[in-house]
Amino acid sequence: FKIADETVKLMQKMTACGELDHLTAERVWLETQKGLNTPSPHIYFEVLRKVGALAVLFPEVEALFGKPQPEKYHPEIDSGVHTLMVLAQAKKLAKQAENPTALLFSSLCHDLGKGLTQEDILPHHYGHEVKGIQPTRNLANRLKVPSEVKDFAILVTEYHTHCHKIAELRPETV
């Protein structure tokens, strides 16, 4: 999959001229839903970033790029790169999901709290799960994401790190 250079330049020009500001939330969500349900959903967001549209349409996601994470847990280091890697992995599980779109959107949103991390504590992101609830809610509300998808994304954002300790929990806790 490759976008012609002329098309990329046109998309960059459209972004720079403010044409994206005239898109309705419903249209952005419709196209995003299509992008999420392609064989490689991360490419949709990579292209948006390449043409400058990610910062306009998904500023919460754009804020993740350039935010380092501890290499011990995330060898890719960059939080934005990590998010797109998670999205690519989630796609492999999406066929088994009751709501594939909810799974994929949640994967995109799961670390939005890292975009709010203060520079002086990087590469750590203490409390990013709870800090990520509001950006996830804001993004979902702005795009008029269906409630079922939004609610699942908020839960995933808040609780996604709990799975790392599941082996330590009592069965009744789980």
Residue map of PLM features:
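Glycine- and charge-enriched loop/helix tracts that form the active or gating conduit
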Residues: 1-104, 108, 112-127, 131-150, ...
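Long, amphipathic alpha-helical stalk/connector segments used for oligomerization, subunit docking
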Residues: 146-174
